[in-house]
Regions:
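Feature targets compositionally biased, intrinsically disordered low-complexity regions
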Residues: 12, 23, 39, 83-84, ...
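Acidic/histidine-rich helix-loop elements
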Residues: 77-117
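Serine-esterase "nucleophile elbow" of acetyl-processing enzymes
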Residues: 2-3, 13-18, 22-94
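Alpha-helical cap/lid subdomain in secreted, periplasmic
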Residues: 65, 100-189
Length: 189
């Protein structure tokens, strides 16, 4: 190759690199525009500690202390129900009655007339305060399933968790904590 061809080729390569860098920068700016800053963290499910000890030892209290101690200005919101099943959690999150009823019907059909735990077909009476959503722009932590409501089917539990996640504006950041059910019907074995 002669000198002119090399110069021409180098100029083309530089232009391609500059164009690629500009496109990458544009993509980064687009991503920045789409990313929303979470106003806090919201805990859904159960804290597994009852009474006064919950105020000191629940994972929400510990999480709030860790955030504060490490300089994060994020509030941890408590949307847990002591002893609440997943159906009640979905109701509290605003999942449609039709969707919740489809789970109940499925549970009743699977039971084939056998007696079910109340959390498999029952939904708690919830107060307006419990169903009011002040957490839509928060990062959800979902820790549910211990008390039932998912017919001992881990795939159904995952689907119910997703139903709650779908009620949030930003679905890019979340934590799902797994727990085995209180009755021991599903284990990791």
């Amino acid at each position: 190759e002669d000198t002119e061809d090399i110069k021409s080729k180098n100029t083309e390569d530089t232009e391609k690199t500059d164009t690629a860098d500009t496109e990458d920068a544009d993509k980064t700016e687009d991503t920045k525009d789409k990313t929303t800053v979470a106003s806090g963290i919201v805990c859904w499910g159960d804290d597994l500690i009852n009474g006064e000890e919950s105020n000191t030892y629940s994972y929400m209290t510990v999480l709030q202390k860790l955030l504060t101690d490490n300089g994060y200005n994020m509030t941890v919101i408590n949307k847990t129900l002591q002893g609440g099943g997943t159906l009640s959690m979905m109701k509290m999150a605003g999942v449609s009655d039709e969707t919740i009823q489809s789970y109940i019907t499925k549970h009743q059909q699977a039971a084939n007339g056998a007696q079910l735990n109340v959390t498999e077909t029952g939904i708690r009476d919830l107060t307006e305060e419990q169903t009011t959503r002040n957490d839509m722009d928060c990062i959800p932590v979902i820790f549910m399933g211990y008390y039932g409501g998912w017919n001992h089917d881990p795939a159904e539990l995952a689907d119910q968790q997703e139903q709650i996640l779908n009620t949030f504006q930003n679905k890019d950041q979340f934590i799902v904590v797994g727990t085995r059910p209180m009755d021991g019907s599903v284990t990791s074995e």
